[in-house]
């Protein structure tokens, strides 16, 4: 009897060998990363100056890394003032160059990395601020040079204080454009140095971005440490 009890205590299933367990854990981790990046959120790096001073980026420097929430817009629509990441419509992609290697082996590895979220996707993703939504009319200048939406000036405290006006004279003197339902008019905070909706008014969407192209809402800057913080979505129609 006593020997039987000892056998019951000492008998059990052995764990998997390390050479099976470790690859299995890696696969599980990659699946979890894929699920998170696909349905919950993703980290992006800012490549240009178009969203200064809200988001820092420039050619040849290390731009802000931002966390993009993919859940919020499953339960609601983007609102004026939101900073969003979106996939560029066709007219926005002219001149876009693939970020994948010409080497087929490396390219395949990059594609796999893109699927699981450890390598940027090979698509022209952009970050801008929603200025007007479906049914609103955007364009024209107020007496003090502010942008008009539905004839009223926006309250835009986030704008770059010293925009390079000589590089982009269309800060508010365009349109007016009535945004199609389900689409969004987007612009950079660095209004004088941003190739945004204003530059695509001749396309099929009149420069707007379709809802299905919206990837998510920018919630926070996570790197560098000196710039960690949330990215606000002010009520820009309050003016």
Outline where the language-model segments fall.
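Hydrophobic alpha-helical transmembrane segments of multi-pass integral membrane proteins
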Residues: 27-35
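A short acidic/basic microdomain associated with nuclease active sites
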Residues: 48
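Soluble "head" domains of membrane/secretory-pathway proteins
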Residues: 2-23, 35, 39-45, 53-239
């Amino acid at each position: 009897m006593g020997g039987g009890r000892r056998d019951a205590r000492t008998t059990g299933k052995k764990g998997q060998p390390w050479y099976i367990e470790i690859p299995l854990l890696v696969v599980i981790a990659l699946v979890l990363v894929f699920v998170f990046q696909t349905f919950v959120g993703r980290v992006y790096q800012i490549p240009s100056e178009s969203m200064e001073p809200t988001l820092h980026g420039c050619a040849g420097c290390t731009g802000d890394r931002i966390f993009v929430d993919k859940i919020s817009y499953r339960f609601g629509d983007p609102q004026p003032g939101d900073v969003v990441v979106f996939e560029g419509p066709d007219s926005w992609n002219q001149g876009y160059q693939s970020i994948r290697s010409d080497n087929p082996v490396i390219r395949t590895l990059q594609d796999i990395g893109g699927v699981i979220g450890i390598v940027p996707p090979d698509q022209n993703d952009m970050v801008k601020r929603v200025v007007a939504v479906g049914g609103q009319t955007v364009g024209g200048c107020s007496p003090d040079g502010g942008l008009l939406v539905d004839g009223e000036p926006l309250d835009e405290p986030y704008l770059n204080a010293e925009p390079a006006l000589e590089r982009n004279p269309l800060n508010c003197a365009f349109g007016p454009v009535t945004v199609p339902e389900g689409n969004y008019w987007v612009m950079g905070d660095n209004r004088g140095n941003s190739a945004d909706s204003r530059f695509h008014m001749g396309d099929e969407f009149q420069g707007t971005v379709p809802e299905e192209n919206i990837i998510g809402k920018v919630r926070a800057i996570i790197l560098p440490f000196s710039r960690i913080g949330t990215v606000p979505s002010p009520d820009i129609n309050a003016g």
